[in-house]
């Protein structure tokens, strides 16, 4: 009703952008005739106009004025370099991002191209722009692909990758536009704030940031803080004993209807993801371990047992992690990708290693940490884009102060979303999924089946194999993950069946009829590999084979031989002239680059460069480009015909096999079908055994099914059921939002402390007025000593001046001649002023002694001792704050707000830490005795 009265707020926003789009389109007439050099020179003109405006605060309104011209320049450059012209809706997306909002743009609408608009405009300030993606591959792809537009216009483009050295990182962060992943940005920020010297700092001050897949980073990953840790030794036997104990304990059944707790050793709360020992469990554990108290601080066991129970019940092999090379490797619950190098903290990973009888790695201690929420709030201007943001609109607004605008699609959506089907049992559900896949496959339509775990994907694979349906399997197993983009690029071909674990998070579009461009690049790689790649470059996986009934696996092939590619992967045989062209190209490239002289990565990068449209003077890249065009041309003829057949048959059909806890992730999976106005359809198959229904309200549905005596293989389709499911999802979303909100509120306390510590550290690294800073520490320490030993309410003759003078001498041994008589008769303020003057004199004397050894040594010592104390005490403080956070939770039972308790006590602990830091620095500076330089004779 409100929307009818006031109008759609999203439509009102979009209406505001229409005149600016018209301005950009009018400018196109002036921009198009310009030569490349004239177009490039416009960047310098725009920069000069910004420079004249002065500081950043004054530049923002000027940026808004420059927007139509800047966007028009980028659109023209993109047309020339990439052969892609921004649609009007993409211009709107660019404006939404420039204004610091979230642009919701559906799959296939060209979000990557949209980011070039605000990143160019904001890079004109010279203060740097960060474009953030979810993985290294996408960061590299976008930097190479979209970076061509920026480089063409005279801007520098940087890329941050996981294995880069600090000097490379510094160089890339100094560029006008830098592409990076969220984790690399966050870890570099933490490392910069642990640097021992300013030369080790790689980032510069943050300015403007555009996040691709913003919901994945700011929502899905918001519960997990970024942590840099160091190893600490713990007793490995305890993990093993706890794992054995957990295996012997019995889980309690659900709470009885009469409220009586059923028998069992421990209870599991899947909603809270926690395990709790019952009284019987405590007794059994203490007896088995031969201890009297599991919580004994001298010999603690409770933490180990809780983690072992969670490893047993809540961390499932091939769902939450896989075992590879005798290691437990985490599987990302949102993307289905493995995350090598990542470990669960707080001893949980060690508990899983003990459960799987793997070698137990040392536990870690936090050295520095920050949540993504507080990290991205460090940017003065933040924006993001995704296909699915509206369901999380409230959280974006409340946590990040980011509004969400839905950008209309360029073409009207033609996708059909069929009603969910719910089955009584999982067995019946999976049989139905296999049957629908077979039916759609027979119609020569491509099918994409999304599963939630490796185990489920392999179950479906075996069911399809029984029906002789050829299919590709894409999950976190190492043998499947290597060729992800090849599988996805061909998932739109007629009759293709692809099973993907957590497809929602994968960045490659599915093109109906197949991706001829990718196939052409693959063919070039196959032809050139055996001639150009060095033999010792290691084994290569072979490529997916789609004509067998089993899931396409990958076997190793020697690097000296082209990978074995099934002929069915390519749409047709190449003509004789094209084959000859490729053979001649191979000979020419061997002459230019050497016989088997490249690595696989080198070859792939050169083919990728040739496949783009950027201008190049490199003769070999030009030859490669011509060859790709020839091969693509032949494939295109077949692919276009196949695309027409797939369209007529109904397009891609997407099957979801379980509702995710978040509606947004379901929408991402649905969004794979019907991109850019293509036809397509989607359906979800569910069962009462699915996690969402089981944990959040399946009893009601089960009751309905039993009441109507529904057969196992008989599905239910009803609007009431769908609404019930969406209600359950909203419950889960609210539950997780509350968790993220709590994480944010608690980390906000740490964030204020972190900022204070890091700004103090940065001042020291910059070497700004170090002596003044240390003397300031000393003066405050003198004041604290006076306040500790002098009571202003007592007469001066009762003040304990002996103790006071003794304490001053403990800190400053150079004042050993100071006596109580010298301070007798002074008032409190006079006493403080006298001691501060004594401190300054003593410090000057100390500086003279130290700098006699080597000029400038005193400044080096100041920097060293301040950083040493900050880092040591901050590390201890992080541990203490973690312990405090765990303990304040129990105070809720005493009618106290745990968050307020945490804030108050945390603040007191922080003040104590800063006081200790100042005192330790003063003590260390006066005790510092550098070794005398040795006689060189």
Swiss-Prot record:
An MF annotation (GO) of this entry: protein-exporting ATPase activity
EC number: 7.4.2.8
Reaction(s) catalysed (UniProt annotation): ATP + H2O + cellular proteinSide 1 = ADP + phosphate + cellular proteinSide 2
Membrane topology field: Peripheral membrane protein
Subcellular location as annotated: Cell inner membrane; Cellular thylakoid membrane; Cytoplasm
BP GO terms, sorted: intracellular protein transmembrane transport; protein import; protein targeting; protein transport by the Sec complex
Binding site for ATP: 90, 108-112, 509
Top EC category: translocase
UniProt record similarity statement: Belongs to the SecA family.
NCBIfam families attached to this UniProt entry: secA
Subunit note: Monomer and homodimer. Part of the essential Sec protein translocation apparatus which comprises SecA, SecYEG and auxiliary proteins SecDF. Other proteins may also be involved.
Protein name, per record: Protein translocase subunit SecA
Gene it is expressed from: secA
């Amino acid at each position: 009703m409100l929307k009818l009265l006031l109008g759609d707020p999203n439509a009102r926003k979009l209406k505001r952008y229409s005149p600016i789009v018209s301005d950009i389109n009018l400018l196109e007439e002036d921009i198009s005739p310009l030569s490349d050099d004239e177009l490039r020179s416009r960047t310098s003109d725009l920069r000069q106009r910004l420079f004249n405006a002065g500081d950043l605060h004054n530049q923002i309104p000027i940026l808004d004025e420059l927007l139509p011209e800047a966007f028009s320049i980028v659109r023209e450059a993109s047309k020339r370099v990439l052969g892609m012209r921004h649609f009007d809706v993409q211009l709107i997306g660019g404006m939404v991002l420039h204004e610091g909002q979230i642009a919701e743009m559906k799959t296939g609408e060209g979000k990557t191209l949209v980011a070039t608009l605000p990143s160019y405009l904001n890079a004109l300030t010279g203060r740097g722009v960060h474009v953030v993606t979810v993985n290294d591959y996408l960061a590299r792809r976008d930097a190479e692909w979209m970076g061509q537009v920026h480089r063409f216009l005279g801007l520098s483009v940087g890329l941050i990758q996981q294995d880069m050295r600090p000097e490379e990182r510094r160089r890339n962060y100094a560029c006008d536009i830098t592409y990076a992943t969220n984790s690399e940005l966050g870890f570099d920020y933490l490392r910069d704030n642990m640097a021992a010297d300013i030369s080790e700092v790689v980032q510069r001050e943050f300015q403007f940031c555009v996040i691709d897949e913003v919901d994945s980073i700011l929502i899905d990953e918001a519960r997990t803080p970024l942590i840099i840790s160091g190893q600490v030794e713990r007793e490995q036997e305890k993990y093993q004993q706890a794992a054995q104990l957990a295996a012997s304990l019995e889980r309690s059944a659900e709470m009885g209807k009469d409220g009586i707790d059923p028998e069992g050793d421990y209870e599991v709360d899947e909603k809270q993801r926690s395990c709790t020992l019952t009284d019987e469990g405590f007794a059994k554990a203490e007896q088995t371990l031969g201890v009297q108290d599991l919580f004994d601080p001298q010999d603690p066991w409770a933490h180990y047992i809780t983690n072992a129970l969670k490893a047993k019940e809540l961390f499932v092999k091939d769902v939450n992690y896989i075992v590879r090379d005798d290691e437990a490797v985490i599987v990302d619950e949102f993307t289905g990708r493995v995350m090598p190098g990542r470990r669960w903290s707080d001893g949980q990973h060690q508990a899983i290693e003990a459960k799987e009888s793997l070698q137990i790695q040392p536990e870690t201690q936090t050295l520095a940490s920050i949540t993504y929420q507080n990290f991205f709030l460090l940017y003065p201007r933040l924006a993001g884009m995704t296909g699915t943001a509206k369901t999380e609109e409230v959280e974006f607004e409340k946590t990040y102060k980011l509004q969400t605008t839905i950008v209309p699609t360029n073409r009207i959506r033609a996708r059909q979303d069929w009603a969910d089907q719910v089955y009584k049992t999982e067995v019946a559900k999976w049989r139905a999924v296999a049957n629908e896949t077979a039916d759609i496959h027979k119609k020569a339509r491509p099918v994409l089946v999304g599963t939630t775990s490796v185990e489920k994907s392999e179950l479906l694979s075996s069911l399809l194999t029984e029906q002789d349906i050829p299919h590709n399997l894409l999950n976190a197993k190492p043998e499947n993950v290597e060729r992800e983009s090849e599988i996805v690029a061909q998932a739109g071909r007629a009759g293709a069946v692809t099973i993907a674990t957590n497809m929602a998070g994968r960045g490659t579009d599915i093109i109906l009829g197949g991706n001829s461009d990718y196939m052409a690049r693959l063919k070039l790689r196959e032809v050139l590999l055996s001639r150009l790649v060095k033999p010792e470059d290691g084994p290569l996986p072979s490529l997916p084979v789609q004509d067998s009934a089993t899931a396409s696996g990958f076997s190793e092939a020697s690097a000296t031989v082209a990978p074995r590619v099934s002929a069915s992967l390519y749409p047709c045989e190449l003509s004789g002239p094209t084959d000859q062209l490729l053979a001649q190209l191979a000979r020419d490239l061997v002459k230019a680059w050497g016989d088997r002289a490249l690595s696989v990565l080198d070859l792939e990068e050169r083919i990728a460069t040739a496949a783009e449209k950027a201008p190049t003077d490199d003769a070999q890249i030009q030859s490669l480009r011509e060859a790709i065009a020839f091969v693509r041309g032949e494939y295109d003829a077949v692919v276009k015909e196949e695309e027409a057949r797939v369209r007529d048959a109904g397009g891609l059909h997407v099957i979801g096999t379980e509702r995710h806890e978040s509606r947004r992730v379901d929408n991402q999976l649905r969004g794979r079908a019907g991109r850019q106005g293509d036809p397509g359809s989607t359906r979800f198959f569910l069962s009462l055994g699915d996690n969402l229904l089981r944990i959040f309200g399946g009893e009601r549905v089960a009751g309905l099914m039993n009441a109507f005596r529904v057969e196992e293989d008989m599905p239910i389709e009803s609007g009431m059921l769908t609404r019930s499911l969406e209600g359950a999802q909203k419950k889960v979303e609210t539950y997780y939002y509350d968790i993220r909100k709590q994480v944010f509120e608690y980390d906000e306390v740490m964030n204020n402390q972190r900022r204070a510590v890091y700004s103090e550290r940065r001042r020291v690294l910059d070497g700004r007025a170090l002596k003044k800073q240390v003397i300031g520490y000393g003066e405050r320490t003198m004041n604290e000593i006076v306040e500790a030993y002098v009571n202003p309410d007592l007469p001066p003759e009762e003040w304990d001046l002996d103790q006071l003078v003794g304490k001053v001498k403990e800190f400053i041994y150079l004042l050993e001649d100071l006596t109580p008589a010298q301070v007798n008769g002074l008032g409190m303020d006079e006493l403080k002023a006298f001691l501060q003057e004594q401190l300054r004199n003593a410090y000057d004397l100390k500086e003279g002694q130290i700098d006699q050894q080597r000029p400038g040594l005193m400044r080096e010592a100041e920097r060293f001792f301040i950083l040493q104390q900050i880092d040591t005490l901050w590390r201890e403080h992080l541990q203490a704050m973690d312990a405090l956070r765990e303990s304040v939770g129990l105070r809720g039972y005493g009618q106290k707000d745990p968050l307020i308790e945490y804030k108050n006590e945390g603040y007191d602990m922080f003040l104590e830490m800063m006081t200790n830091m100042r005192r330790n620095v003063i003590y260390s500076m006066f005790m510092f005795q550098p070794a005398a330089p040795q006689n060189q004779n």
